[in-house]
């Protein structure tokens, strides 16, 4: 996933019901390469249509691609080796409630095959209400989707408190929640309206396991010089610092490793503890709230001016990185 200097943004989820794979064939082998190339050559949703029309077939793609551009375009593409189905978010027939959601199955694929149906139920219900009330924002998506622990099939929400001590053990099984133990990031691209400069497109980026990660704003303009160290891969870490800190906390959450399959057990009490107020998510979301507050005032100024202030970005990054580092140091040293 990513965005480019034209304000074109692209994300994908692996679909599991569009292609009948054979033997040891890798599903969606070209999915990542397609994103990389499309960000190089596309500026609009229409460009992406042309891109899909003209790439060689079979394409080795099996994915749902979400696309937005700086001209007001927004669409979802379900793509297999030879064809694609497009769903226009500006067309009430395709998006009657103003949004399109996907997990790991495609509407154009085989019925009841694929993955992520229970997660889709949760995303759809959350987005429907938020769309009706005009409350879909980047911060909302991180808090209410990326950190959702509601399972619609079981009709439970771990955040209700009923699964914490003393009512329960404080442990639960990681099954069909939107954030999974394998989730490596959460990204929200905040696009621009027609007439606004594409450089104002903001890619809110959370690296690592979303319930233990903190989102930060990134911009394409001068990114080669300005991108903060906390999102850059470093030799001293196996990942960028933001990802490393998040995953170290996640390792404590998924800490039961006594035999096969036990990695699915979630130390919910450590992640969220409403009685004591000291779970990781409480500290993480408070820190992220401050990131959004700090960035909001600058974004408002830049939108009024009509362009980014690249002189102010390094100072913002230094301030954010300093405060985020302190939060993680405190959490990592607490046990």
Predicted regions and their residues:
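A conserved hydrophobic secondary-structure block that centers on an alpha-helix together
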Residues: 43-50, 55-56
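Short arginine-rich
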Residues: 57-63
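C-terminal, well-structured catalytic/ligand-binding subdomain of enzymes
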Residues: 1-3, 8, 12-40, 63, ...
